Amino acid sequence: ILGSTLGALLVVAQVLKGWMHISPGEFVIVSFFGIAFLPCPPLFDWTASAPFPFDGPAWSLFFELVANLLLASFAFLRRPRSLLIFLPIAALALTYFTLQSGTFDMGWKYETFPGGAARLAYEFFAGVLIYDFWRKGYRWHLPPAAAFALLFVVAMGSAFTQSMFRMAWDLSMQLVFIPLIVALAANATVSGSPARLCTVLGNLSYGIYMLHIPILIAMGLMTNHLFGEDQVSGLTMTLIVAVLATIAAALAHTAYDVPLRKTLTQRL
């Protein structure tokens, strides 16, 4: 909600500055879909074919809500045997859409929206299966050296720039390495300062994800206006947005998310 509100305010600011031309009716229609948290049909050019024009990352939350609804409604989706049948199908769909679109970055626009559905279907229900194994007492552990080696291999994947290697790397990340890292991390035990740090990072992570795009757009508009278009380097912009998104996420968690959750819990 907060991310979409910030995105809507940015659109209003651009209209008032004369940088965008949007009729009040168009804004109301898009706002309705944003408030209802439904994908907005690609009715207007200014939405850039985005299902959630005010806050692009909201597409994944939409699919997560759909997946949670399916999980709550159909008991068979919680059975390991059903998941072991469903996940290969989801993996095939994810592979198909990734190869078709030429990228793993799917879901944030309508051209790749079905790929986003496949992406969330595999990742979400892989998480359900991992949790089921964990709940039943299965534990996976790696020696520290092997764990660091695994993280190093994952990080080095960003060096692949050729399309063929990058595609194979993205698919291996989606289908194997990321679920493996989640399974291993779920069995890790931490205490003291590392545990507190993990808690803080966990509290901030979702806010950073949902707020970084509106902040990126705002900073892009501001720096272009002050210094000229594309005069700020990508690294500088990344650092600025990272710092601001972290601060915004901390404020949102403390002043918005926690009080709202407490109120809803008491009333519901």
Model-derived features with residue positions:
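Alpha-helical transmembrane segments and their helix-entry boundary regions
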Residues: 60, 83-84
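Alpha-helical transmembrane segments in multi-pass integral membrane proteins
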Residues: 42-48, 73-82, 102-255, 259-268
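Membrane-interface helix-loop-helix regions
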Residues: 3-65, 96-97, 172-186
